[in-house]
């Protein structure tokens, strides 16, 4: 009888028993990422354990390493909110000096990456360190009290962007750090989502195998900060892809003229010219994604705000070289 090989290694580097919230999408992301990293190290260096982690303060640090306990089954160091990339750079330099084969994984949330740690990240990428930076993006400072970050989407409620008579909630467009990383002309940049775990695993493995720096921005649901049902995390993340809210793409060697766009699914029609995706007609409206989330519920009383969000998404896709057709619910 044939035995089917598991789609990913059964080795575990993120142990159960950590303190993450029930339904935490970021915990899922880190478990998958470390598995994928292990596979890449085994394929490249013959050693599945040939990696170490430098992790910034944030949700996943706090829930995984409350002294004297840890959920990590790999060499791991907790560093400050702003310097995961800098610490990873130092570890990588030490490994190079000592002749240690392997790769360093730096991990930070959207606050520690898009805001506080952006300078350190830029320096790491520009210097060409052999490090993969994984940004888990749950779109706010969830660990410290659900405060807005520059990665918070337009219109979202947070404790520092509360909607009201004179406020729509978050009033700035989302910052796409992946595009900033690509501007450094590094070997590999990608966006991913727990809503498409196989794509995520493939991209982490690809990032881990390149020589030089790589950056992966993964979209993670947060039931606590997003006010969503615990059991719908993967479904909601998938809806972000299928409605156009979260694009899946790859940029290699800073070549923004040849961005590789992954099809969103959900019945969307994808049109190509010369092998490049140039137009996507989405079937599902963004309201399908918004309706499950308490952080967006006030927008349904302000349809003009949803239209503004829709326009911002179209503008983001235009930057990627794609004309996005986003339907309204009645269409």
Swiss-Prot record:
<protein>
    <recommendedName>
        <fullName>Pyruvate synthase subunit PorB</fullName>
        <ecNumber>1.2.7.1</ecNumber>
    </recommendedName>
</protein>
<keyword id="KW-0479">Metal-binding</keyword>
<feature type="binding site">
    <location>
        <position position="24"/>
    </location>
    <ligand>
        <name>[4Fe-4S] cluster</name>
    </ligand>
</feature>
<dbReference type="InterPro" id="IPR051479">
    <property type="entry name" value="PorB-like"/>
</dbReference>
<dbReference type="Pfam" id="PF02775">
    <property type="entry name" value="TPP_enzyme_C"/>
</dbReference>
<keyword id="KW-0004">4Fe-4S</keyword>
<comment type="subunit">
    <text>Heterotetramer of one alpha, one beta, one delta and one gamma chain.</text>
</comment>
<keyword id="KW-0411">Iron-sulfur</keyword>
<dbReference type="GO" id="GO:0051539">
    <property type="term" value="F:4 iron, 4 sulfur cluster binding"/>
</dbReference>
<dbReference type="InterPro" id="IPR029061">
    <property type="entry name" value="THDP-binding"/>
</dbReference>
<feature type="binding site">
    <location>
        <position position="21"/>
    </location>
    <ligand>
        <name>[4Fe-4S] cluster</name>
    </ligand>
</feature>
<dbReference type="GO" id="GO:0030976">
    <property type="term" value="F:thiamine pyrophosphate binding"/>
</dbReference>
<dbReference type="GO" id="GO:0019164">
    <property type="term" value="F:pyruvate synthase activity"/>
</dbReference>
<feature type="binding site">
    <location>
        <position position="59"/>
    </location>
    <ligand>
        <name>[4Fe-4S] cluster</name>
    </ligand>
</feature>
<keyword id="KW-0408">Iron</keyword>
<dbReference type="InterPro" id="IPR011766">
    <property type="entry name" value="TPP_enzyme_TPP-bd"/>
</dbReference>
<feature type="binding site">
    <location>
        <position position="222"/>
    </location>
    <ligand>
        <name>[4Fe-4S] cluster</name>
    </ligand>
</feature>
<keyword id="KW-0560">Oxidoreductase</keyword>
<dbReference type="GO" id="GO:0046872">
    <property type="term" value="F:metal ion binding"/>
</dbReference>
């Amino acid at each position: 009888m044939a035995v089917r090989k598991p789609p990913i290694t059964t080795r575990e580097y993120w142990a159960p028993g950590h303190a993450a919230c029930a339904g935490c999408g970021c915990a899922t992301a880190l478990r998958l990422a470390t598995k994928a990293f292990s596979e890449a190290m085994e394929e490249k260096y013959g050693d599945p354990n040939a990696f170490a982690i430098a992790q910034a303060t944030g949700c996943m640090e706090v829930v995984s390493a409350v002294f004297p306990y840890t959920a990590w089954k790999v060499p791991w160091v907790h560093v400050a909110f702003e310097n995961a990339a800098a610490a990873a750079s130092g570890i990588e330099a030490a490994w190079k000096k000592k002749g240690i084969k392997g790769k360093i994984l730096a991990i930070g949330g959207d606050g520690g990456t898009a805001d506080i740690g952006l300078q350190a990240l830029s320096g790491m990428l520009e210097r060409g360190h052999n490090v993969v930076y994984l940004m888990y993006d749950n779109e706010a400072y969830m660990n410290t009290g659900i405060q807005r970050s520059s990665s918070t989407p337009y219109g979202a409620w947070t404790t520092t962007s509360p909607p009201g008579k004179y406020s729509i909630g978050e009033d700035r467009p989302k910052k796409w750090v992946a595009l900033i990383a690509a501007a450094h002309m590094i070997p590999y940049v990608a966006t991913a989502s727990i809503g498409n775990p196989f794509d995520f695993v493939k991209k982490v493995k690809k990032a881990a195998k390149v020589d030089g720096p790589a950056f992966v921005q993964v979209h993670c649901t947060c039931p606590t900060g997003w006010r969503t049902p615990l059991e719908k995390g993967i479904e909601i993340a998938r809806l972000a892809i299928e409605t156009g809210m979260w694009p899946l793409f790859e940029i290699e060697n800073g070549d923004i003229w040849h961005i590789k766009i992954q099809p969103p699914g959900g019945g969307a029609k994808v049109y190509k010219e010369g092998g490049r995706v140039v137009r996507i007609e989405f079937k599902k409206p963004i309201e399908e994604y918004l309706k499950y989330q308490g952080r967006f519920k006030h927008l349904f009383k302000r349809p003009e705000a949803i239209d503004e969000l829709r326009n911002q998404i179209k503008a983001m896709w235009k930057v990627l070289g794609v004309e996005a057709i986003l339907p309204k619910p009645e269409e």
